[in-house]
Amino acid sequence: MHLEVIVQSYKKSKYYFSHTFYLYKFIVVNSPDMLHISRLGLFLGLFAIVMHSVNLIKYTSDPLEAFKTVNRHNWSDEQREHFYDLRNLYTSFCQTNLSLDCFTQILTNVFSWDIRDSQCKSAVSLSPLQNLPRTEIKIVLSSTTANKSIIASSFSLFYLLFATLSTYTADPPCVELLPFKILGAQLFDIKLTEESLRMAMSKFSNSNLTRSLTSFTSKNFFNYTSFVYFLLYNTTSCVPSNDQYFKQSPKPINVTTSFGRAIVNFDSILTTTPSSTSASLTSPHIPSTNIPTPAPPPVTKNSTKLHTDTIKVTPNTPTITTQTTESIKKIVKRSDFPRPMYTPTDIPTLTIRLNATIKTEQNTENPKSPPKPTNFENTTIRIPKTLESATATTNATQKIESTTFTTIGIKEINGNTYSSPKNSIYLKSKSQQSTTKFTDAEHTTPILKFTTWQNTVRTYMSHNTEVQNMTDKFQRTTLKSSNELPTIQTLSVTPKQKLPSNVTAKTEVHITNNALPSSNSSYSITEVTKEVKHTRMSASTHEQINHTEIAQITPILNAHTSEKSTTPQRSFTAETFLTTSSKPNIITWSNLLTTTPKEPLTNTSLRWTDHITTQLTTSNRTQSAKLTKANISSQTTNIYPQTITGRSTEV
């Protein structure tokens, strides 16, 4: 009689899980001569099982074994949901349809990457993936015990899904069905456009997959540009010479892609950095600055290797880096991908060195009477053409015109790191008629361009210098009695430095009108900051600035409303008039009480604030077209009693 004993055991890798099946056959023959052999075989078999269970026997297996041996139809609802979410995501934005088996293999490759395995597996080196922040999804396999699962990084998942062409485990027929467009080099047939990529990212962030995400992070921020060039590196060959080329090459490396010209530092990618599970992800990934350029000519379909001689080295190009700060951590509320910095209701407490705002203009035929918006969150500013004259003063007799606009501030958090509500900013090119919106999921290059703009502004405006006390330049006008409307109050501002003739800028202040302790009051927070129109300029005495970028962009203003009101309503305006001349200019504001307060407003003040603010109405006024940086002081006016105090503030 023959007895076959089949023992199945599972391998638990340290960093990923797959199934390895060992078949132990012990042939027991009904013969006394073979009894001692069968006993010895049984003993050795049991010994092997015990040693395997305590993970003392080392072995290797194909990462695909997990899905090759597990019937996906036996998965739990959650596993199946994850799988089909990812498959639908792929098939929705790729023109080549994949079979379930082929996509299963792709997905398995994504899940199975051992990012801590530094050994070369065919043409793929996985150690650089260690630098990616670890936001992971854990899917438990139904055919195993509870602690058997597959782990996938949500940050590398989507990109790896579209980069499986470099894996050695995929079958050739499956690889041929995976045409990817990576770095503008058409290795295969797929047409993955920027728009489809952005939509895929958005769909990915809103899918059910995010419900199982848990946050991890590493010391280095995730960089999509760096990651895809890591893939480029891996499609060459896994030989020491290539390793040395990238590790020892001058940094950064300037490469042309279908998304523009980008800078990547391979040395930082190839440096292993341990992950940390103690902090949440803290900042949107900021790729190197891209300048739009035509896509490079396509590579033939059979060209599966990209050689290093196609990469141009530019050692003198500055590298922009970011750091995690505690203040940024306070902003992030979610770990979804792409993750927003904060919601409009989350006003973070930050150390702000500079408040800057980007403005967008709407081109309408009648600039004097723009439609009054109903949703202030997405409203854009328009400045009537009548504001372009040199007159810089207003008075109470002028007609009040409803010119509604709102502002969103992009706040400098730490060094050259900026944040903005909803993680979106607007840029407008001189050569374009329309305004283009960029979000974090689509592109973060404008933030770096904005940083370059800040360096330019810093060059000419010296906003880091100490603020001068200009309280003596107030034209102090106070309220006469509680039964009268407030008169116009003015503040004289002297520009600090005259700008070059080819640079125009506007600096405005935002003032908070608080009525305390009265409950029958309202206030709106108004923030008006600087607007810069760039032309090509020299920065020879300062840090290197990319002139092409400066010439291509004009910072513009986005919109957000922050207003609290009760009765009686009291509208509030604040505006500045700063020209390139050295003469003082006037800031005016007015308090218009619609009704007489029932009780004295003992602590009504006009003061500086750092919050995201909104100005809802402006008076019909004229304004200089050329404006510049200046030091200003804010004024506090108490209605009852009539006292005036001054406070110096830097804009």
Curated annotation (Swiss-Prot):
Task: Indicate yes or no for the key word Metal-binding.
Answer: no
| Region (Disordered) location | 275-303
InterPro entries to which the protein is assigned, alphabetical: Roseolovirus_U47 (IPR008645)
Task: Write down the Pfam families for this protein, in alphabetical order.
Answer: Herpes_U47 (PF05467)
Which N-terminal stretch is annotated as signal sequence?
A: 1-56
Q: State where composition is biased (Low complexity).
A: 275-292
Which keywords appear in this protein's UniProt record, sorted alphabetically?
Glycoprotein, Host cell membrane, Host membrane, Membrane, Signal, Virion
Give any Gene Ontology cellular component: host cell plasma membrane
**Is Signal among this UniProt entry's keywords?**
yes
Q: Which residues are glycosylated?
A: 74, 97, 147, 208, 223, 234, 254, 302, 355, 378, 395, 469, 502, 520, 546, 603, 620, 631
Query: What's this protein's family per the entry?
Result: Belongs to the herpesviridae U47 family.
Its name, as the record gives it, is: 120 kDa Glycoprotein O
Question: Which organism was this protein described from?
Answer: Human herpesvirus 6A (strain Uganda-1102)
Q: Which gene encodes it?
A: U47
